[in-house]
Amino acid sequence: MAKYDYNPKYGLENYSIFLPFETSFDAFRSTTWMQNHWYQSITASVVYVAVIFTGKKIMEKYKPFQLDTPLFVWNSFLAIFSILGFLRMTPEFVWSWSAEGNSFKYSICHSSYAQGVTGFWTEQFAMSKLFELIDTIFIVLRKRPLIFLHWYHHVTVMIYTWHAYKDHTASGRWFIWMNYGVHALMYSYYALRSLKFRLPKQMAMVVTTLQLAQMVMGVIIGVTVYRIKSSGEYCQQTWDNLGLCFGVYFTYFLLFANFFYHAYVKKNNRYTEVKKDKKEKEEPVDFEILEPKEDINANIAEPSITTRSAAARRKVQKAD
């Protein structure tokens, strides 16, 4: 269960500027609610999967919606939210491992971030995983490919985050800080993409590389916590949550590594947008819209996605 570990060196006392809703945050009320309702993340996940696949089936009868402006607004909102969360979590995060008497071990074993300013942004982080499911609604309505990596990632992140929040998992400060930072870049990238900006391939590679680094760090932290707890020392993370941690981060690493390989390393990769103008270079798409061409309606006036090799594409072009 959650352990309150308030340290007067952090929280409101560690911030020169704070917002009204941060000072009024009630950690006890928030934690109690999550302990009584965290399992609803599983219910929400089941409903989510049913809705998106039903929606995908229904959309087969309709043309894709043009949602560039709403998509830009949505991604911009999530980018700003993530930037604020990252900035507000950073002072306590740095203090947790760099202040006198603190260490990396302290930062992953003491949940002193669960109240005050960081407590508020931790709660918002957990709740945001529910609202981020809206990402998939845009994919379905725009008839973009819906891949396993996308919906699996959304579902498991939400369930794990809610489970970790109810226990005040100490290593969560690392996961939250990293995720806020990666999402700040990722959603900013998506916002620009929604405005049809031509962005260099390196930007997508940076986002994916940071996502992979996040997974590697998650596994390292999990192993460290396991060793500490196995030695009989105190570390605020339940065995159940630690098991979930290993499971989700290991599978994320495999999935994102597979995506990175096929999108940026392997020649004639599966994840390529084929441009109508042959003078334009083919460029990899982000993991939000990856899928073989067969899943796309042939009448959609958008760049298609193909799994064919370069040789196969040349044959088709000659036949035309």
Curated annotation (Swiss-Prot):
GO MF annotation list: fatty acid elongase activity
Enumerate the UniProt keywords alphabetically: Fatty acid biosynthesis, Fatty acid metabolism, Glycoprotein, Lipid biosynthesis, Lipid metabolism, Membrane, Transferase, Transmembrane, Transmembrane helix
Top-rank EC class of the record's enzyme: transferase
GO CC entries = endoplasmic reticulum membrane
Pathway it acts in?
A: Lipid metabolism; fatty acid biosynthesis
Question: Pfam families, from UniProt?
Answer: ELO
Tell me the domain of life. Answer: Eukaryota
Q: How does it sit in the membrane?
A: Multi-pass membrane protein
Q: Where in the cell is it found?
A: Membrane
Q: Which residues are glycosylated according to the annotation?
A: 14
- Reaction(s) catalysed by this chain's protein: a very-long-chain acyl-CoA + malonyl-CoA + H(+) = a very-long-chain 3-oxoacyl-CoA + CO2 + CoA
Enzyme Commission numbers on file = 2.3.1.199
Similarity comment: family membership: Belongs to the ELO family.
Task of the protein: Could be implicated in synthesis of very long chain fatty acids. May be required for normally rapid growth.
Can you say what this protein is called?
Putative fatty acid elongase 3
Q: Which gene encodes it?
A: elo-3
